[in-house]
Amino acid sequence: DPKLMTYLAVETIKNCEVIAVPADGKEHAISYKIASGIVTDMNQKECLALSSPMTKDPNVLNENYQNVSKEIMKKLDEGKDVAYLTLGDPTIYSTYIYIQRIIKESGYEAEIINGIPSFCAVAAKLGDSLADRSEQLHIIPSSYDIEEALELPGNKILMKAASKLSDVKKILRDHELEAQMIENCGMEEERIYQNIDEMPEKAAYYTTLLVKK
């Protein structure tokens, strides 16, 4: 939803000549589509397509971060400001952080414009809090082993759940836990699931679960 973008994010995009997207092209970038809904001159800006591989191999990822950073720095050397678009908040499981570190270490200026984290948007959509009073809250990447994390006290946010949703559902049942889930929160394809039984075996990439004891 473009209206969920912060005023600072919108103003920053408006003031940048180059828009970088983590995709093969702007037509494949959800973040570009969202921003275009509120920044009216997006099509007049130069778009830099910077895709990243879907892998956990650190060597492959680090090589990609270096290559992406070089492409951005080329534009900076031309005297152009670059806005790198990302979904949610760039401090939470975002490719941008790795790129920013390389760019800053190379002597360029780079900053983070905070956004609304996906799990905050999910909780708001569900009409529930993430944590009350003294409750703990844990953010867990469910594409890795989650069983130990589920033993922690308090509520849990399971991110990156799509690729292992079937396994996640089984683990939650084994631990006698209940969960709610939103697929593509804030997008046209949004789907809300109020319990594990409603959840499909596979889901879209942007899928987040809220587990409350």
How does the language model describe each region?
Residues 26-28, 55, 117-120, 187-189:
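Short gly/pro/ser/thr-enriched loop/turn and capping motifs at secondary-structure boundaries
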Residues 91-152, 200:
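Class I SAM-dependent methyltransferase SAM-binding "motif I" and its flanking Rossmann-like core
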